[in-house]
A protein has these predicted regions:
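Positively charged, solvent-exposed patches that mediate nucleic-acid binding
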Residues: 1-108
Length: 108
């Protein structure tokens, strides 16, 4: 799994046209024809619990992304967690993520 690292990478994805939001997270996506890889970035605010809670949220998001990574289009993606995500059951989060991928037509 390749991650977005620099502020420049994050800013270019934030300015992209494709995004989907629900009550759990905001998904940003930018197609990247030049790269033959998929890159992901996770953003979890300090408004979401303590460090243990934020790491739990990141682990869940990372696992959901890893499960669907093989079927995604090449590009850069950011998952921005919203307040309250730490209280959501894993299955509901997974279903919301899959629905967002379908709505944005990101499944190859």
């Amino acid at each position: 799994m390749v991650t977005l690292n620099t502020k420049k990478d994050f800013d270019s994805v934030y300015k992209s046209q494709k995004k989907w939001h629900n009550s759990y997270f905001i998904l940003f996506f930018k197609e990247n024809q030049q790269r033959a890889e998929k890159r992901i970035g996770f953003s979890v605010s300090k408004k979401i619990g303590n460090a243990v809670c934020r790491n739990l949220v990141k682990r869940r998001l990372r696992n959901i992304y890893r499960d669907s990574m093989s079927s995604l289009k090449n590009g850069d993606m950011i998952l921005l967690a919203k307040v309250g995500l730490e209280k959501v059951e894993y299955k509901n989060l997974q279903d919301s993520y899959k629905y967002a991928l379908i709505r944005l037509n990101l499944v190859a």
